Amino acid sequence: MAKEPQRVRRRERKNIVSGVAHVNASFNNTMITITDAQGNTISWSSAGAMGFKGSRKSTPYAAQVAAEDAGRKAAEHGMRTLEVEVSGPGSGRESALRALQAAGFTVTSIRDVTSIPHNGCRPRKRRRV
């Protein structure tokens, strides 16, 4: 007996005008999550999800492509204005922000929410190249 083809449920369109874009730029990858004001995820994307592998994930171009993808998905739900929260030391911080602005979003505020330890965990050893 043949299996029934699975029905793919289409995402219902939420009419959310403003939200928060969380840009997490690590040394290895850049992740962009767009949420509503309460913190519920509307769309997300990352450099790895866009098909970049290895050291290419950490490039500014990969962050730009990921931000464009997350922005396009959020715009489908009617989002127009964004607050941007940037965290992490990675190279994709500025390019992700510029890509969101170029995608047609009005950026109302930019906040750096990078956590700084009050002398917490011991850091990684220094690289010797």
Swiss-Prot record:
* GO annotation (BP), single: translation
Q: Which InterPro entries match?
A: Ribosomal_uS11, Ribosomal_uS11_bac-type, Ribosomal_uS11_CS, Ribosomal_uS11_sf
Q: Which GO terms describe its cellular component?
A: ribonucleoprotein complex; ribosome
**Gene Ontology molecular-function annotations:** rRNA binding; structural constituent of ribosome
Matching entries from Pfam families are given as:
Ribosomal_S11
Q: Which SUPFAM superfamilies match?
A: Translational machinery components
List keywords of the entry alphabetically: Ribonucleoprotein, Ribosomal protein, RNA-binding, rRNA-binding
- Classify the source by domain of life: Bacteria
Main function: Located on the platform of the 30S subunit, it bridges several disparate RNA helices of the 16S rRNA. Forms part of the Shine-Dalgarno cleft in the 70S ribosome.
In the record, the note on similarity to other proteins reads: Belongs to the universal ribosomal protein uS11 family.
How the protein assembles, per its UniProt entry? Part of the 30S ribosomal subunit. Interacts with proteins S7 and S18. Binds to IF-3.
Q: Which PANTHER family match?
A: 40S RIBOSOMAL PROTEIN S14/30S RIBOSOMAL PROTEIN S11
Q: What is this protein called?
A: Small ribosomal subunit protein uS11
Organism annotation: Methylobacterium radiotolerans (strain ATCC 27329 / DSM 1819 / JCM 2831 / NBRC 15690 / NCIMB 10815 / 0-1)
Q: What is the lineage of its organism?
A: Bacteria, Pseudomonadati, Pseudomonadota, Alphaproteobacteria, Hyphomicrobiales
Could you tell me the gene encoding this protein? rpsK
